[in-house]
């Protein structure tokens, strides 16, 4: 029987990746309840890791099909901020290496702020290229949100340090000569698009937090410009500022009533 204590066993188990490991096999015969509990936790962890890798590989199917055709540089493109009443629309384009593995990458809306921030840093370290596009509230009013979104996406693609050979885009088509595939709910079905959604989301959230420091009465750092009850009440009380989208109904109606 292994004589090391439970804490030492717990620490060493983190280095074991295969149940055929000789030391692990000895643990299976250790009668201490604490040891057997750690063994079961190890099995659960490995099963969770297996499921996550399978999910990731499923999300890589669009990229893999392009890799199989000899295409190397694939940019995922996504945007954040089409619906808010204030702030810009932000798009990101991300080119990942072919052999990338990004566990837990997903549609940014499904992730906690902490997880998004963690993945944001990891993606920045691992990506071959990242491009950002930002279109202001004023230009959204001038163009309309759909055209502004396309412009932000094109800006993001043009900002890439590496020219992409193919674009994977979340439910959009942009007027560029680069071959592209539009994927419905792409941020949940493509690793590259999910990565771009995280970059765009964190980038925009940070901008809105800065706006919250400039205009603390509006609470932008909480609602990120979306039409929450708190935000609508602040608009009624304090009026419309430059960063509000005047073409959006709640803002337009507030302006009609006079500031």
Swiss-Prot record:
Residues 72-259 form the RNase H type-2 domain. CDD domains: RNase_HII_bacteria_HII_like. It catalyses: Endonucleolytic cleavage to 5'-phosphomonoester. Its main location: cytoplasm. It is found in: Cytoplasm. Keywords: Cytoplasm, Endonuclease, Hydrolase, Manganese, Metal-binding, Nuclease. It is an enzyme of class 3 (hydrolase). Its cofactor is Mn(2+); Mg(2+). GO terms for molecular function: manganese ion binding; RNA binding; RNA-DNA hybrid ribonuclease activity. The keyword Cytoplasm applies. It holds the Pfam family RNase_HII. A divalent metal cation binds at residues 78-79, 170. Transmembrane segments: none annotated. Gene3D superfamilies: Ribonuclease H-like superfamily/Ribonuclease H (3.30.420.10). The keyword Cell division does not apply. Manganese or magnesium. Binds 1 divalent metal ion per monomer in the absence of substrate. May bind a second metal ion after substrate binding. One of its GO terms (cellular component) is ribonuclease H2 complex. GO terms for biological process: DNA replication, removal of RNA primer; mismatch repair. Its EC number is 3.1.26.4. Belongs to the RNase HII family. Endonuclease that specifically degrades the RNA of RNA-DNA hybrids. This is Ribonuclease HII. The lineage of its organism: Bacteria, Bacillati, Bacillota, Bacilli, Bacillales.
